[in-house]
């Protein structure tokens, strides 16, 4: 049920057979120094689900992404991936276990050409060719120094290798930020392709329409707590507006 809000029958059958969540947060609090940003956040995500995390600025969405990826330490609570406690694992260890935070433009080597960047991340010629077919701009700019690309082009260069080997859980924190509409579309196409390959996607996106078009489920946050969690098709306009205005 891609983007319909209904899991497809396969997933539904699995769920009936007691499929374990791929990711579970139990009463997770987190913050920076003395300032707590997340207050007792709990939810489960099933394998293959697409979750849109919505909310006003300051709702704690980026902190949530960081806690799941391991770039922000959880102050308390449990964080389980496929049933394994993960709170003490580094971001690097989590990435090896398949929990990956979308690279920002810093996921590239700015001093090297586009081709050299792809060669480092994609070992095979077919893999590099596929990346350029998926993101034609990388073929056009193949000799250009990566640091001189536009933000959108850098984002596509950072995303390309991940699609060659999609992770189990991909956390995309505002993937369209600063991108032209065309570049944003190619990134969203890439995310959609990932989910079709079975990746569980956690999507934080200012363009709510884009996020909702892809999402099976929506989590709304306000001031560090989850205020709504349900199927995307049940989300009404009033609730959506309230989410962005902070009530």
Where are each of the predicted segments found?
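The feature captures the beta-strand-to-loop junction immediately N-terminal to the Walker
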Residues: 54-56
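ABC ATPase NBD coupling module
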Residues: 73, 85-106, 128, 142-143, ...
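Conserved ABC ATPase signature
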Residues: 145-149, 153
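Conserved ABC transporter NBD signature motif
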Residues: 77-85, 97, 125-133, 228-230
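Helix-to-loop junction immediately C-terminal to a conserved catalytic motif
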Residues: 69
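ABC ATPase C-loop
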Residues: 162-163
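Catalytic Walker B motif of ABC-type/P-loop ATPase nucleotide-binding domains
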Residues: 170-174
């Amino acid at each position: 049920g891609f983007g319909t809000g209904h899991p497809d029958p396969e997933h539904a059958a699995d769920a009936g057979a007691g499929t374990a969540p791929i990711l579970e947060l139990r009463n997770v609090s987190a913050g920076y120094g003395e300032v707590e940003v997340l207050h007792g956040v709990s939810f489960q995500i099933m394998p293959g689900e697409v979750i849109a995390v919505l909310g006003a600025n300051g709702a704690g969405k980026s902190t949530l992404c960081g806690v799941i990826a391991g770039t922000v330490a959880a102050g308390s609570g449990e964080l389980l991936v496929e049933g394994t406690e993960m709170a003490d694992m580094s971001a690097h260890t989590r990435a090896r276990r398949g929990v990956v935070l979308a690279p920002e433009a810093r996921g590239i080597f700015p001093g090297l050409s586009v081709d050299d960047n792809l060669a480092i991340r994609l070992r095979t010629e077919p893999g590099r060719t596929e990346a350029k077919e998926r993101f034609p701009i990388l073929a056009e700019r193949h000799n250009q120094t990566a640091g001189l690309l536009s933000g959108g082009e850098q984002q596509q260069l950072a995303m390309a290798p991940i699609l060659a080997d999609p992770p189990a859980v991909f956390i995309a924190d505002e993937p369209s930020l600063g991108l032209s509409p065309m570049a944003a579309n190619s990134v969203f196409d890439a995310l959609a392709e990932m989910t079709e390959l079975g990746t569980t996607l956690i999507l934080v996106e200012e363009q709510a329409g884009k996020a909702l078009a892809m999402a099976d489920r929506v989590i709304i946050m306000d001031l560090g707590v989850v205020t709504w969690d349900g199927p995307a098709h049940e989300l009404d306009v009033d609730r959506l507006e309230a989410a962005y205005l902070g009530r």
